[in-house]
């Protein structure tokens, strides 16, 4: 049995040029596992705490030297001599050492980087791909599927500097026969979208997640230009390709109302739920994330009752990968899907528990990146190893996004038909 002999933390940069945490876990046989913690822009209020230094003389206060010191000090001391394969024991030990509900003492960014680095070291120690080790930890050894990518090709909201209120407009290649074919379809649509925008004289600069970020007449206008790009790429909207939204509604929820400032419209929860229902009737939108504010559970119930039978309603800020909050949502029949982000909860073990709880209740689980990413591609292995079926990892440019897609291509090739791509079968309706 290999043992942990050293743990090292360091400050590195994420895709927005902000510091984040990287950790190395070294074993006594020379194996090293390394992982980086991502960082979000539109964040749920109940997420685990990302520890920042607050020292305005460094990185505008966004340094993470405190989190790094926690890795190199108390976390290292705690885990030396431990077995990296016992992921649950490692994670529970760090949770206990932290002693807070939201990991505010050590920082979720510190704990997560070590948690994932340990998993990578353990996989190498067993001569397993990371996805196979994750499947073992998940209690589903040898069971894999390739995820349907939800490709964010128009960015708005907090992910872009434009007038579009809805944060993400995504395409899903549900008609593909494999992940690699789906990736090709999405990439072709992305390039055709650029041409559509250029023809309109619109900006083709990209946002945080690699999608285009033009100023448009309305949120629906984004759906129109995407529809045109899909057709120009030679695909049929609704059969080959479907659409998805991430409203990130908490970002435009003010005084109990939903304020679409880009359109000059203000809605009640009932009104905004009806607005979204109208979009699903006019376009093949089969998934909507954070359609209402994280605290507006009454509004979420209205939305779920209106369209939840046919549309995947994903809780991101709503559930923050937290099993306690997810259980409450399941009990109250709020939403029907959870977005899974490692750093919202802070350990691999708790992430797997959230996926398992969702699946047991008939909810889907969508594996997701954050807007602040690195070259770390762990979420690709997580999606395959848990057979989650869906992944959100941005658009078809920026290496911080493409690194995940490329890892999925490698995994699909390695599994050589043993991991099915289920396409439309992963969704409701």
UniProtKB/Swiss-Prot annotation:
Its main location: cytoplasm. Gene3D superfamilies: Enolase-like C-terminal domain (3.20.20.120), Enolase-like, N-terminal domain (3.30.390.10). GO terms for biological process: glycolytic process. CDD domains: enolase. Keywords: Cytoplasm, Glycolysis, Lyase, Magnesium, Metal-binding, Secreted. It is found in: Cytoplasm; Secreted; Cell surface. The keyword Transmembrane helix does not apply. Its cofactor is Mg(2+). NCBIfam families: eno. This is Enolase. It comes from Pseudomonas fluorescens (strain ATCC BAA-477 / NRRL B-23932 / Pf-5). The gene is eno.
């Amino acid at each position: 049995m290999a043992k942990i002999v050293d743990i090292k933390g360091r400050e590195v940069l994420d895709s927005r040029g902000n510091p984040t945490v990287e950790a190395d876990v070294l074993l006594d046989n020379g194996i090293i596992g390394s992982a980086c913690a991502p960082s979000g822009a539109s964040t749920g209020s109940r997420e685990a705490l990302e520890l920042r230094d607050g020292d305005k003389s460094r990185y505008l206060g966004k340094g993470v030297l405190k989190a790094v010191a926690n890795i190199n000090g108390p976390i290292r001391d705690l885990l030396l001599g431990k077995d990296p394969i016992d992921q649950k024991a490692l994670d529970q030990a760090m949770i206990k050492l932290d002693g807070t509900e939201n990991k505010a003492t050590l920082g979720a960014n510190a704990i997560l980087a070590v948690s994932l680095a340990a998993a990578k070291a353990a996989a190498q120690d067993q001569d397993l791909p990371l996805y196979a080790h994750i499947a073992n930890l998940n209690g589903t050894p040898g069971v894999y599927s390739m995820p349907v990518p939800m490709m964010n090709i128009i960015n708005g909201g907090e992910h872009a500097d434009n007038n579009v209120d809805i944060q993400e407009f995504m395409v899903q290649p549900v008609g593909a026969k494999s992940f690699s074919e789906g990736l090709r379809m999405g990439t072709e649509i992305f390039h055709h979208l650029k041409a559509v925008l250029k023809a309109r004289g619109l900006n083709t600069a990209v946002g945080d997640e690699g999608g285009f970020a033009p100023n448009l007449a309305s949120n629906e206008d984004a759906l129109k230009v995407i529809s045109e790009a899909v057709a120009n790429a030679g695909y049929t909207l609704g059969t080959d390709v479907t659409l998805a939204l991430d409203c990130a509604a908490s970002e435009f929820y003010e005084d109990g109302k939903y304020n679409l400032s880009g359109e000059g419209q203000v809605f009640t929860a009932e009104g905004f739920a009806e607005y979204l229902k109208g979009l699903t009737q006019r376009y093949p939108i089969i998934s909507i994330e954070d359609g209402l504010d994280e605290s507006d559970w009454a509004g979420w119930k209205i939305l779920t009752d209106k369209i939840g039978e046919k549309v995947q309603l994903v809780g991101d800020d709503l559930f923050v990968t937290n099993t306690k909050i997810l259980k409450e949502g399941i009990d109250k029949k709020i939403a029907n899907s959870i977005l899974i982000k490692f750093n919202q909860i802070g350990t691999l073990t708790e992430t797997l528990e959230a996926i398992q709880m969702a699946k047991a209740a008939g909810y889907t689980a969508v594996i997701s990146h954050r807007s602040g990413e690195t070259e770390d591609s762990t979420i690709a292995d997580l999606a395959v190893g848990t057979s989650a079926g869906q992944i959100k990892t941005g658009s078809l440019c920026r290496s911080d996004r493409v690194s995940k897609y490329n890892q999925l291509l490698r995994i699909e090739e390695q599994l050589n038909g043993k991991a099915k791509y289920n396409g439309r079968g992963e969704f409701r309706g």
